[in-house]
Amino acid sequence: MKAKHIVVYLLLAIVSSSCIREEALNAEADILSCILPGVAMTTSPIINNNSITIFVGPGTDISELKPEFTLTPGAAISPLSGTERNFNTPQEYTVTAADGVWKKMYTVSVIDTELATNYNFEDTLGGKKYYIFVEREGDKVVMEWASGNAGYAMTGVAKTADDYPTFQITDGKAGKCLSLVTRSTGFFGQIAGMPIAAGNLFIGSFDVNNAMSNPLKATKFGLPFRHVPTYLAGYYKYKAGDQFTEGGKPVNGKRDICDIYAIMYETCESVPTLDGTNAFT
C-alpha cells in the first residue's frame, strides 16, 4: 500500500514541476528591419538570411553611418544598434538569440552608386552552396542578382551548385555565362504541389520565407533606376524541354518558352515593389 502512495506522490511531483517550468527563451537571431536615421534610403533594405543591402543616393557620405536594427524578441546585436561605422566597405554584425546560444552573422553593405546597366554574368560570390551572381565596380559589389535558388535549396535535391536551376557555365559568347534550366523538385516538391522549378534571375530580392507558402509573392522585383531606357540587348541560346508538363502531368501539343524582359514602373506607398502576382498588370 505504501508503495502505491509513493508512486502517486512521484507522479504528482512530476506533473507539478512541468506546470511551473519556465518557457524556453527565444532561439531566433534575426534582423527584421533596418533604418538609417537622417539618411534617405532610395528603397527598402534587402534583408536576406545572412546579408543586408541598403541603398542610398549617389554622393551620400557613407563613411559615418549609424544603422539601427529591429531584432527578434530578446535578441542582441554586436556592435550595438546605432553604432557609427564606415560603410565604404561591408560591415559585419553578430546577432545573439535570447537563449544566448544561437548566433547569426550578417554582412551589411551600403550601395551609393547607380544601378548597373551592363551585365556579363562573370562574377559570383564565392563560398556559397549555390551561385549568387553579382555586379562589381572595382572590388566592390554594387548589386546582387536574385533568383529562386534559395527556395530550391529547401528541396534537398541539389548536391552541388551546378544542380540548381540557376547556375554558371563556361561556354558563353565570351567567357562565362548564366544558365537557366528547369529542375525536378523531388519528393519535397511533389508533396508541396510544385513538382518542377524553372531557372530564373532578376533584379530585386527573393523572400525565402514565402517560397513554399506563396512563391509568387516571394519574388520582389526591381531596384531604383534613374535613367530613360532605350533598349534591351544581349546574347542568348534557348532549347525547349522535351516534354511540356503542367501540375506534374505531360501536356501534348505545348512547348515551354523563354522570357527575357525589362519592366519599368513607379512605386507608391501601398505598392513599394512588384512581385509575381502583379508584375504585368
Regions found by a protein language model. Give the residues of each.
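Short carbohydrate-recognition loop motifs
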Residues: 168-188
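Bacterial Sec-dependent N-terminal signal peptides
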Residues: 1-30
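Short helix-loop boundary/capping segments
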Residues: 231, 235-281
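Extracellular carbohydrate-recognition regions
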Residues: 111-153
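Beta-strand-rich interaction surfaces with strong enrichment in secreted/lumenal proteins
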Residues: 82-83, 219-223, 281
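Short, exposed beta-strand/loop patches in secreted or surface proteins that constitute
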Residues: 40-47, 69, 158-172
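Beta-rich interaction/scaffold domains
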Residues: 19-119
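Secreted extracellular polysaccharide-interacting domains
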Residues: 181-224
